[in-house]
Amino acid sequence: MARAVGSVRGQPSRLIFPVGVHHVQRLIELVGLSLTQRRDMLICVLGTVSCLRVGEVENLQLCDLKWGHDAAWHSDYEGTMAVGVYKRKQDQVRKLLYPRVGSSVTNRLRAFVEELGLEVSDECSKERAPGARCRTCPPVFPRTVNGTEHSRPVSRQQVTNAVLNSLRMLEADTTHFSGLSMRRGGISAALVARAPEPILFLQSGHGSNNAARNYTVPRNPHPL
């Protein structure tokens, strides 16, 4: 609503920076973090490399994580994974999209999940209804990580806070960052790397450079 009112009044949109590749590289190397800090760091990193929206991070369930998804095709992909996004803005017919995630992020996420004792339910419904939310599997990112109650997912506000908390771990100024910074960072990195349009679609859901450019911030702003 605020964005719509602002456009009518001719006000510029709020400046939002992307989570950069340099942020992701530094975050994934952090050690000595508490469980809550690790959850926040992984939200920020996974959300960025998978080009996820805040609501998509909130909706992630353990059965959406496809460990070793591409390993059967080539051994180089052992230790990586895919993330099943069961509901995406551009996926009106629920074909699902599976952004790929490299081994360094996969290893950290798997260790986090195992430490919390999260497991896919024996009654998981994803195989029967892959385009629907599972009623039995736990969230990837629980609202609370202390104790044994992990059935409630993080809220959207917690996802946004996780991005800001992660950047504060790097002593970054968070004035111009928000939950949107994850998706903006992933798409920006893909376009700067000149990823082909089909690859951009598979990772982010955006099927055209015209649509993706709304999220794009160049890695080097000097030419601007």
What is the role of each PLM region?
Residues 1-224:
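Extended, non-catalytic subsegments within catalytic or DNA/protein-binding/adaptor domains
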